[in-house]
Curated annotation (Swiss-Prot):
This is Large ribosomal subunit protein uL11. Belongs to the universal ribosomal protein uL11 family. Part of the ribosomal stalk of the 50S ribosomal subunit. Interacts with L10 and the large rRNA to form the base of the stalk. L10 forms an elongated spine to which L12 dimers bind in a sequential fashion forming a multimeric L10(L12)X complex. One of its GO terms (biological process) is translation. Forms part of the ribosomal stalk which helps the ribosome interact with GTP-bound translation factors. It comes from the Bacteria. It comes from Wolinella succinogenes (strain ATCC 29543 / DSM 1740 / CCUG 13145 / JCM 31913 / LMG 7466 / NCTC 11488 / FDC 602W). The lineage of its organism: Bacteria, Pseudomonadati, Campylobacterota, Epsilonproteobacteria, Campylobacterales. Keywords: Methylation, Ribonucleoprotein, Ribosomal protein, RNA-binding, rRNA-binding. GO terms for molecular function: large ribosomal subunit rRNA binding; structural constituent of ribosome. Pfam families: Ribosomal_L11, Ribosomal_L11_N. PANTHER family: 60S RIBOSOMAL PROTEIN L12, LARGE RIBOSOMAL SUBUNIT PROTEIN UL11M. One of its GO terms (cellular component) is cytosolic large ribosomal subunit. One or more lysine residues are methylated.
Length: 141
């Protein structure tokens, strides 16, 4: 018989840096999950992912056990790294703060393809281009 799911939790945690302090500790503690067990498993799985924030979907079962799925870093983090900036523009229509090439956009789209709700690579590229524009980043050839 399958275990009964009592909750699902979505978090963004820096790769390889999960620890019992907020926001991880309180979120897991109030659901009765073994915090250190999760932190060790998450850090082991994400130790090679750089310094990105990693989205994680944690499924908690009635016996307080859990499973989790790690996803790729957010598109905005990948765009910021490609453009070499710290944050997006406060006024993206007037202030362009960086440039990325179409090749970089295609690479980001290929990386995120499984997490995006796009049916084709072209659709994924358009999603990434839209995110870049809303951050004040120009796309050049």
């Amino acid at each position: 018989m399958a275990k009964k799911i009592i909750g699902e939790l979505k978090l963004q945690i820096p790769a390889g840096k999960a620890n019992p302090s907020p926001p991880v500790g309180p979120a897991l503690g109030q659901r009765g999950v073994n915090i250190m067990e999760f932190c060790k498993a998450f850090n082991e799985r994400t130790k090679d992912m750089g310094s990105f924030n990693i989205p994680v979907v944690l499924t908690i079962y009635q016996d307080k056990s859990f499973t989790f799925i790690t996803k790729k870093p957010p598109v905005t983090d990948l765009i910021k790294k490609a453009a070499g900036i710290q944050k997006g523009s406060d006024n993206p229509l007037k202030n362009k703060i960086g440039k990325i090439t179409k090749a970089q956009v295609a690479e980001i789209a290929a990386t995120k393809m499984e997490d995006l709700n796009a049916k084709s690579t072209e659709g994924a590229i358009k999603i990434v281009e839209g995110s870049a524009r809303s951050m004040g980043i120009e796309i050049v050839d």
